[in-house]
């Protein structure tokens, strides 16, 4: 599967990032779409994506997940010897444009931006 860069997130304001996320379904939305998320219903997600409901502020787990991203990348590299690169782009599937990805990090054979399209997400 290949993806294109929808937007750079490097210096993007949080509010702008939330607006971009309305354009599709990301990893955090997948469990909601499947009906297995106990915190949000598919109808609530649809209402958020269509601007009929304000997105809820991220909870404690999401906060700590974001805070610990750099630590997890560093520990993975320490244990495996594989470098993890920061990906400061919001990616969109070329085959299924509703699919979005905002990666915490990437390693291996990933080419983004001026190179070949991202492959094998």
What spans do the regions from the language model cover?
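Acidic-basic catalytic patches of nuclease active cores, encompassing PD-(D/E)XK
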Residues: 62-85
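Short, glycine/acidic-rich beta->alpha junctions
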Residues: 68, 97-98
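A short acidic/basic microdomain associated with nuclease active sites
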Residues: 77-97, 104-106
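Short, flexible loop/turn elements at secondary-structure junctions
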Residues: 60, 68, 90-91, 107-111
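Active-site-proximal segments of catalytic enzyme domains
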Residues: 72, 103, 109
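Active-site beta-strand-loop-beta-strand hairpin of nuclease catalytic cores
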Residues: 106-121
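Coil-to-beta-strand transition motifs
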Residues: 98-100, 118
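Charged, glycine-rich intrinsically disordered N-terminal tails and low-complexity linkers that flank
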Residues: 1-67
């Amino acid at each position: 599967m290949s993806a294109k860069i929808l937007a750079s997130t490097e210096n993007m304001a949080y509010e702008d990032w939330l607006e971009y996320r309305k354009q599709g379904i990301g990893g955090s939305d997948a469990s909601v779409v499947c009906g297995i998320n106990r915190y949000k219903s598919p109808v609530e997600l649809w209402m958020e994506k269509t601007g009929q409901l304000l997105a809820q502020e991220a909870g404690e787990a999401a906060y700590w997940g974001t805070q610990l991203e750099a630590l997890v990348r560093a520990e993975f590299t320490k244990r495996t010897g594989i470098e993890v690169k920061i990906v400061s782009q919001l990616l969109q599937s070329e085959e299924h444009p509703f699919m979005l990805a905002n990666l915490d990090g990437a390693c291996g054979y990933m080419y983004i931006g001026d190179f070949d399209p991202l492959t094998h997400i």
